[in-house]
UniProtKB/Swiss-Prot annotation:
Gene that this sequence comes from: rpsP
SUPFAM superfamilies referenced in this protein's UniProt entry, alphabetically: Ribosomal protein S16 (SSF54565)
The family this protein is said to belong to: Belongs to the bacterial ribosomal protein bS16 family.
Matching HAMAP family: Ribosomal_bS16
Keywords, in A-Z order: Ribonucleoprotein, Ribosomal protein
Organism listed in the record: Campylobacter lari (strain RM2100 / D67 / ATCC BAA-1060)
GO biological process, one term: translation
Protein name per Swiss-Prot or TrEMBL: Small ribosomal subunit protein bS16
Superkingdom of origin: Bacteria
Amino acid sequence: MTVIRLTKMGRKKRPFYRIVVTDSRKRRDGSWIESIGYYNPMVEPEVVKFDAERLAYWKSVGAKLSDRVAAITSK
């Protein structure tokens, strides 16, 4: 199953996340199909950038959103 979830980037105690499309069987930081955006919770206000067209495309072909991705993309 294809999922859209966060993969952790950044350094120790300074997390930064990519919003990626991947197979659900892959590890969190494993290989991914496409990167569609990023999320930075460490700055004020939080920065969320993603390609809405690509998100809509992947949802239309059956990709599931993780809970956290669903929450941050609905803002």
